[in-house]
C-alpha cells in the first residue's frame, strides 16, 4: 500500500520510532542491488531517513556514485519501505546530528572517525502498519 510520506498515519510514525533494524538497498556500479542490515532514523519534519556508516563501506561508495536507496523495516506482518534519492553527507555537524538521533533510537554508536551519513530524501513510502481486519478480504 502506498502512503503519503508527508502525512504518515500515527501507526506508521510509531513503527518508525520503535527499535527495529531494517535493510538498506543501494545499487552497485554494475546496477545490481546491494542489500545490508542497518539501523536508521526517521526525520518527519524533513522527510528524510539517515543511516550512519563508514566512508569506505560499499553502501557509502554506492551512494557517492549517485544511487537511489530504499530502507525497509519489517516486524511480523508490519512493514514500511522508504525510498528516494540518497546523498552522502560528511559535514561534522551533520554527522553529529545523525549520531545523536541514532543514539536516541538504538544506542550510542561506537567511535568512528570515518563516519558519514547516508541521507534519503523520501519521495515514496510503501507499507502496511495496521493489521487488516478479517472482513476486509
Segments the model singles out, each with a brief description of its role:
Residues 19-55, 69-72, 82:
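Short beta-strand segments
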Residues 1-23:
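Short, basic/aromatic recognition patches
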Residues 8-11, 35-37, 56, 105:
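A generic local structural motif
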Residues 1-7, 77-137:
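Charged, gly/pro-rich active-site loop segments
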Residues 20-21, 68, 107, 125:
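Generic structural signal for secondary-structure transition and capping sites
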Residues 31, 66, 109:
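An amphipathic, aromatic/His-enriched active-site/gating alpha helix that lines ligand/cofactor pockets
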Amino acid at each position: 500500500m502506498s502512503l503519503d510520506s508527508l502525512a504518515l498515519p500515527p501507526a506508521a510514525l510509531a513503527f518508525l520510532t520503535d527499535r527495529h533494524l531494517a535493510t538498506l538497498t543501494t545499487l552497485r556500479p554494475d546496477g545490481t542491488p546491494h542489500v545490508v542490515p542497518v539501523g536508521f532514523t526517521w526525520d518527519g519534519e524533513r522527510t528524510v531517513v539517515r543511516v550512519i556508516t563508514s566512508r569506505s563501506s560499499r553502501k557509502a561508495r554506492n551512494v557517492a556514485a549517485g544511487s537511489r536507496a530504499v530502507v525497509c523495516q519489517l516486524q511480523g506482518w508490519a512493514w514500511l519501505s522508504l525510498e528516494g534519492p540518497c546523498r552522502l553527507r560528511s559535514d561534522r555537524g551533520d554527522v553529529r546530528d545523525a549520531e545523536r538521533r541514532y543514539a536516541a533510537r538504538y544506542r550510542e554508536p561506537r567511535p568512528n572517525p570515518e563516519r558519514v551519513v547516508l541521507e534519503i530524501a523520501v519521495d515514496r513510502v510503501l507499507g502496511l502498519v495496521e493489521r487488516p481486519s478479517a472482513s476486509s478480504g
